[in-house]
Amino acid sequence: MATISKLINEKGVKTALSFAAPDDAEGIQYVIEKLGYAGVDYSYLGVNLYADRNGINDYVKTLRATVKEKAADKQLIVSNIKFPRKNEDETASTETQADSIYNLLSASISDSNAGGLIYDEAEYVGSWNGFFNEQGLAQTSLAVFGFAQGWNIDIDSYRDPYEYGDDTGLKEKNVTINKISNMSESTIRGVDVGSYVALTNAGVKYYDYDGKEQPLMKILKDNGVNYIRLRIWNDPYNEKGETYGGGDSTVDNGLKIGKEATKYGMKVLVDFHYSDFWADPAKQILPKAWQKDANDPDKMCENIHDFTKDTLQKFKDAGVDVGMVQVGNEITKGMAGIHNKDSNNSVMK
């Protein structure tokens, strides 16, 4: 990890790290110490959170205070979160979704931490957690990113209830969302759109508040998003050439999305999972092509180095504005085939 972070920084790109949120917010100190011992050079320290965590905003404030004390030059961000806009007991709405995002974003920001968050599954249409309803129409909760900057976004466009059958939440209640103090250009207002190509290939379309079909990236930019995250899987196909699903997050698809994001003035976060599919606290499975080298640390370092370097070169050649690179995903207990928090020092080095 130290070697890869050095390579990334030499390319003029900032390094991000993402960890599953520790049970105790002050437990992030252990992570910071391990990274320091290993000599990992990073700019962003991200924590992945679940929306149902009790006291989530106070938890993030405690994280923020701990990072300020132990690693004052690092920017703490929420690297993965999603909130429901509807649920079975009908207590969720676009209003509660927007409030939750706004409050968490606010909790991450202080006079010493630019903060920010990356919203997961933002591109999913009809998802209970996404920003687009079953017809692909942008929901008013998406506008929270712009409102938090003090933007005046028109969300009061006409909607035909017989066409959309949609509870617009914020629009109907005329909720005012104030600008967040201490927000800066460095504050991350990001969304994960790693499945965008797979969804558009399946025929999914996106519409703005006027009901006009628009590219997803334009809708996001117009609502205050400044970063998009792309997860990168090495080879997400089985022996028959069939995708494992999950959005078909290949390098080639990432390049397509990255070029469109750059076109609309957003930066790109490239998230290397160093796996053929999802990597998370429960699994860090080596890519098929690297499994033969599992017991050869030098060869494994070479594999990770070359894949990282070659992929970033492709993004550079394509003109994609890569603002940060995330090394691994939820690497609290390991990465790249190593899955034990007590023995992952070799990964960090």
Q: What do these predicted ranges mean?
A:
Residues M1, E163-K256, E260-K267, S275-N303, ...:
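N-terminal substrate-binding region of glycoside hydrolase catalytic domains
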Residues M1-V40, L49-A65, E69, N87-Y102, ...:
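Active-site cleft segment of glycoside hydrolase catalytic domains centered on the general acid/base Glu
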Residues K6-E10, I32-D41, R64-A71, I109, ...:
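Acidic (Asp/Glu)-rich catalytic clusters
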Residues K14-G27, N57-K68, A198-N226, F272-H273:
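Short secondary-structure boundary segments
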Residues T15-L17, S43-V47, L76-S79, G115-Y119, ...:
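Hydrophobic faces of well-ordered beta-strands that scaffold small-molecule active sites
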Residues S18-D23, V47-D52, I81-P84, D120-A122, ...:
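Active-site beta-loop-alpha junctions enriched in small/polar residues
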Residues K68-A72, S110-N113, Y119, Y158-Y162, ...:
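First exposed extracellular module after export/assembly in secreted or surface-exposed proteins
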Residues K86-N103, A107, D111-K179:
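Aromatic-rich peripheral "rim/lid" segments of glycoside hydrolase catalytic domains that contact
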